[in-house]
């Protein structure tokens, strides 16, 4: 997998998309074989990523969701976030379960999940709108250097429509 990325990105070698694709296909086959024996959450997450993006295999969000759900149930925070996000974005899973997976990942400190959940509460998507909770989540995410969350905080504090206007906080974020 790492060799495929090196060929794809031209790191330590000349960029060669054909070689990269061949190595990604080998990696996918290897991960698939290993996962069948081990049921390792990291392999399941990686297989889900590869299926979601079509890297080394055909793009298949249904299969990606399957692997992510297996990994999520084993406690893989990245899979919890990826599964919840996929279900919310393409409308294929139970929206309440999607929010529950993102919440679980956010509570485990995943900055991307905190940002995504902040948007869910800001916009009232499948949950009651709660700006206080949204700001709390955006802040947790921004404190982990998530630039998107920092931008949202800056916008919210500058506008002062849903939270008290605070120009200093807007500038800080």
Model-predicted segments: where are they?
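TPR/TPR-like (Sel1-like) alpha-helical repeat modules
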Residues: 18-29, 168-173
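Glutamine-centric residue-chemistry signal
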Residues: 19, 25, 44, 74, ...
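Hydrophobic/aromatic packing residues within the alpha-helices of TPR/SEL1-like helical repeat arrays
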Residues: 24, 31-32, 68, 102, ...
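Repeat-mediated protein-protein interaction surfaces in helical alpha-solenoids
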Residues: 28-36, 98, 134
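Hydrophobic face of amphipathic alpha-helices that form TPR/SEL1-like repeat modules
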Residues: 2-9, 30, 44-53, 57, ...
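Short helix-capping/linker turns of helical repeat alpha-solenoids
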Residues: 9-11, 16, 30-33, 37-40, ...
């Amino acid at each position: 997998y790492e060799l495929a990325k090196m060929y794809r990105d031209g790191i330590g070698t000349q960029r060669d998309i054909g070689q990269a694709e061949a190595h990604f296909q080998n990696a996918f086959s290897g991960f698939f074989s290993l996962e069948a024996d081990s049921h390792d959450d990291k392999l399941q997450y990686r297989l889900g990523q590869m299926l979601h993006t079509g890297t080394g295999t055909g793009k298949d969000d249904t299969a990606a969701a399957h692997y992510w759900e297996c990994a999520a149930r084993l406690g893989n925070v990245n899979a919890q976030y990826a599964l919840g996000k996929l279900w919310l974005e393409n409308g294929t899973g139970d929206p309440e379960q999607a929010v529950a997976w993102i919440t679980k990942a956010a509570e485990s400190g995943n900055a991307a999940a905190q940002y995504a959940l902040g948007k869910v509460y800001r916009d009232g998507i499948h949950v009651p709108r709660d700006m206080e909770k949204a700001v709390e989540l955006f802040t947790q995410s921004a404190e982990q250097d998530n630039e998107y969350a920092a931008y949202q905080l800056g916008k919210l504090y500058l506008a002062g429509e849903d939270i008290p206007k605070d120009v200093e906080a807007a500038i800080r974020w």
